[in-house]
């Protein structure tokens, strides 16, 4: 999704890692709408919003249970899915680098599932300038070798975390644990709690904090 009137080498890119519904009962790939998450503000700000069809999501779902593993077999396949997401991410950024309209300012934005289960790609992909996590954190629901807990201390890039105090899906301990574990220097990580539930977060505050963060870490 690109803003109108973009010029050569002018676009920053925000790669979106969506919520759980895109791994369960997603819309058709041509029906994806950034406005569903209220993320159209990214496009209106003059940036491109990149929404890949990750393995296990949208039109690439083979078995929904792999993305929400409950058995040992599904857990084994989920671990493979982690590698698939890393490859999908690298290929997406390679593609952006091959197109003249995009510059090197590339950001990670994860919402819910994308702020919980896919953040390991931040360790393996060094081309991200910064990350924004909406209602994300560390989860104890799956073993450490899969949930990124072992990776988080090795992540050094700037990370903004926006969460709700009344979130019944992602309790306050989850983002606090991730924030404490991040290897990012203290001045380059930020955790904000709003008096809200899981989603939506207060829109005006979310927009202000997000755009300020992206602008702060661009080339």
Kindly give the residue locations of the regions a language model identified.
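Short beta-strand/loop motif that positions the catalytic acidic residue
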Residues: 155, 161-163, 167
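Short beta-strand element of the alpha/beta-hydrolase
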Residues: 9-21
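C-terminal catalytic histidine-bearing segment of alpha/beta-hydrolase fold enzymes
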Residues: 184-219
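Gly/Ser-rich "nucleophile elbow"/oxyanion-hole loop immediately N-terminal to the catalytic nucleophile
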Residues: 9, 67-112
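Cap/lid segment of the alpha/beta-hydrolase catalytic domain
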Residues: 20-87
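Short beta-strand-to-loop junctions in surface cap/lid or active-site-entrance loops
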Residues: 1-10
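Acidic catalytic loop of the alpha/beta-hydrolase fold
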Residues: 165-170, 199-200
């Amino acid at each position: 999704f690109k803003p109108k009137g973009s010029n050569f080498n002018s676009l920053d890119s925000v790669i979106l890692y969506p919520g759980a519904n895109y791994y369960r009962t997603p819309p058709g790939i041509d029906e994806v709408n950034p406005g569903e998450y209220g993320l159209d503000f990214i496009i209106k700000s003059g940036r491109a919003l990149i929404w890949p069809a990750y393995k296990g999501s949208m039109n690439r779902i083979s078995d929904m249970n792999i993305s929400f593993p409950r058995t040992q077999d599904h857990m084994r396949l989920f671990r493979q899915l982690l590698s698939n997401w890393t490859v999908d991410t690298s290929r997406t950024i390679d593609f952006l680098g091959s197109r003249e309209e995009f510059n090197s300012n590339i950001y990670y934005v994860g919402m819910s599932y994308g702020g919980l289960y896919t953040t390991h790609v931040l360790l393996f992909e060094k081309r991200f300038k910064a990350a924004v996590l909406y209602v994300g954190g560390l989860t104890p629901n799956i073993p450490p070798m899969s949930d990124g807990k072992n990776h988080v201390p090795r992540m050094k890039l700037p990370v903004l975390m926006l969460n709700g105090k009344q979130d019944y899906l992602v309790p306050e301990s989850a983002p606090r644990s991730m924030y404490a574990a991040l290897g990012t220097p203290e001045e380059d990580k930020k955790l904000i709690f709003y008096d809200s539930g899981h989603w939506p977060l207060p829109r005006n505050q979310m927009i202000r904090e997000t755009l300020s963060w992206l602008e702060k870490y661009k080339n």
